UniProtKB/Swiss-Prot annotation:
Residues 36-52 have a biased composition (Basic and acidic residues). Keywords: Transposable element. This is Uncharacterized 15.5 kDa protein in transposon Tn4556. Residues 35-59 are annotated as: Disordered. It comes from Streptomyces fradiae (Streptomyces roseoflavus).
Amino acid sequence: MVKPPLRCQGGQVARGHRALSIALKTEDLVGGLSITKDRGDRDDGRYGEPRIQRKPGQLTANDPVAYDFVRHVASVSTRDLKVGVVDGQRIPVRFAHDKSAAWAKDTPGLCKCLGRVRHVLEHAVGPGTVDAAVLERERVDIA
């Protein structure tokens, strides 16, 4: 059975995943957009149709990138983590498409990953549509 996309409910990400402000902001940025509008030749698993077969965490040119990004960033429950929590306060942010990780208190590492966030979002919603200041505010909120 195909699971529905993640949705925000009362400040939390659905299905028991830990809420991350950057994931919530991402949903705001891409909400209401038809991410698959230019992929009409592809079946969409979110609506009960067959999906292209791929390995878990693998992005392909045919995937709706923003949807996958939200899913990957939101999937930081401890059972999914490859990186352990060091002091119980750092929030791990894992990008499954390149297996990189950043800790909320690791400012240089997080800034580097935010560059990837902007790239992924712009690929999904169009060049020049993602404000770097928004991502910078999110970095402060996470830290």
